[in-house]
Amino acid sequence: MNILFTGASSFTGYWFVTKLAEAGHEVRTTFTRDSAEAYGDDVRGQRVRRVAERSKPLFSCPFGSAPFLEYLKNERVDLLCHHAADVTDYKSPAFDICSAVANNTRGVQEVLKLLSRNSKAALLLTGSVFEGGEGAGSEGLPAFSPYGVSKAATADICAYYCRAAGVPLGKFVIPNPFGPWEDARFTGYLMRAWSNGDVANIRTPAYVRDNIHASLLALAYVAFAEALPATNDGFRRTNPSGYVECQGAFAGRLAQEMRLRTGWECRFECARQTEFDEPRIRINTDPVNGVALGWDEAVAWNKLAQWYTP
C-alpha cells in the first residue's frame, strides 16, 4: 500500500513505520520540523533519522497544512495513518484540550475529501487506553487526564467526518508500550536504576495496567492496517493487549527477564500505595497472538536488554 503516516517521531510511531516498511509498504512520513537535524541528538532525534532511512520523509508538513493537502492532491494514498497528536505538557492538569483538538484535526474535512478520491482509501487513527470509555477497568472508565479527553474528542471528530466523506475509519488503541527506542518512563526508570546497581522504588505498584512490547504492538498495527482498506462496515477498532497485571508484578516480570540477560541484581521495592489519582485498573481487551504474527518473545526481551546494556 501507499501509506501516509503522521507522528513518526514518537516511540510507537517509529516502531509502526519500521514494521510497515519491513512488510513491503511504501511509507511517506510527515514531520512538523524542517529537517531531521532539527530534532536534535536525543532519542527522539535518533528515531527521526532512522525513520527517514526507512521511509520517504516530508518535513515541514503538519497534518492538515498546505503542504500536507498538496501532497494528497497530487499523490494516491491508500491508507492515511494519523498517529500524530498534540502532546505539549500532556501530563499537566493545565494541558490545553481545545488547542490540542484543533491541532489534531486541523483541516480534517479537506483531508478526508482528498483522501476519498481513492474509493478504497481509509483513515487509521491512533487512540489511547487513557481516553474515557476505552478498554476495560474501574471507576466507570473515566479519562485519565485532559490529554485523554483531547484524544477522545479527536476520535469523535474524525469519526463524524469520516462518515460524512464515506471514508472507512479504523481506531488502534494503544495501552502501555515499552521497548528499545522508548522515552524515559516506567520501564526506562527501572532499567536505569538496575544498570547502576540501585534499588528501584515503585510508588504505584497497585495500579493494574497493560504493558506490551513495542515490537509486538507494531506487528499488530501492521495486521490491522493491512485489513482496514478492505473493510466495508465503516468502522473498526482494536484494543491490543499484552501483560495485564499490577505494576509491581510487571516490575517483577521485567526483573526476572533482565537478571537472565544482564547479570544485574534488579532489586526493587514496592511502596504501600495509598493514593490513587488515576483509575486503579485500565487495560485493553484484545490479547495479541504473537506466534501468529511471527513474533518471538525471547528475542524481544533480548533486544530490550541489549538496548539498555552499556
What are these regions (language model features)?
Residues 190, 196, 220, 227-275:
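Mid/C-terminal beta-alpha module of Rossmann-like enzyme folds, strongest
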Residues 80-82, 106-146:
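Conserved Rossmann-fold NAD(P)-dependent oxidoreductase catalytic core, especially the SDR/UDP-sugar
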Residues 214, 248, 269-303:
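Conserved C-terminal active-site "lid" loop/helix of NAD(P)H-dependent oxidoreductases
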Residues 6, 174-180, 201-212, 233-246, ...:
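Glycine-rich Rossmann NAD(P)(H)-binding loop
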Residues 159-210, 214-222, 254-255:
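NAD(P)-dependent short-chain dehydrogenase/reductase
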Residues 56-103:
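NAD(P)H-binding glycine-rich loop region in Rossmannoid oxidoreductase-like domains
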Residues 146, 150-153:
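Active-site helix of classical SDR
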Residues 1-76:
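N-terminal Rossmann/SDR dinucleotide-binding element
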